[in-house]
């Protein structure tokens, strides 16, 4: 988690802050602490998966309480079950971006602050690159992603 966050912060030339969570028991977050200064900053939460969005929405709330100007979240796998959509819709998060690795339910697709990025274009390009014997790691560069998503990248993100 932290190594990926550090790499992302470096790529977008932004300072790194961390939301450290402590659990008393599984499924319950007892305490969240912000490591770093978020005052006046647009914060980006990055995680691999989100189910009911309780922890995600709490993290966004703690960031705002610590002076963040805005909070946006990017989650690879948006399970978004149970109360997730309602929590996200009512949260302080300005936006949540997920991929289509899990098929979106109707409420997820209709939520005004949830955007879904299709994975097919990048997977297709990865397969083509492997077939052609060219670099797959180049797919992690913005200059390579823009043409794959045909100029849609800024709208999606």
Please state what every model-predicted region is.
Residues 1-157:
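PRPP-associated nucleotide enzymes
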């Amino acid at each position: 988690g932290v190594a990926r966050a550090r790499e992302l912060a470096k790529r977008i030339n932004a300072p790194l802050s961390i939301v450290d969570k402590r659990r008393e028991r599984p499924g319950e977050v007892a305490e969240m602490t912000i490591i770093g200064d978020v005052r006046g900053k647009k914060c980006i939460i990055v995680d691999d998966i989100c189910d009911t969005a309780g922890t995600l929405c709490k993290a966004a709330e703690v960031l705002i309480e610590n002076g963040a100007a805005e909070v946006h979240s990017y989650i690879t796998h948006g399970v978004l079950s149970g109360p997730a959509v309602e929590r996200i819709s009512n949260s302080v998060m300005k936006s949540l971006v997920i991929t289509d690795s899990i098929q979106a339910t109707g409420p997820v697709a209709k939520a005004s602050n949830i955007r879904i990025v299709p994975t097919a274009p990048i997977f297709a390009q990865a397969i083509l690159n492997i077939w052609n014997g060219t670099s797959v790691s180049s797919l992690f560069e913005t200059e390579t992603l823009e043409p794959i998503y045909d100029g849609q990248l800024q709208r999606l993100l």
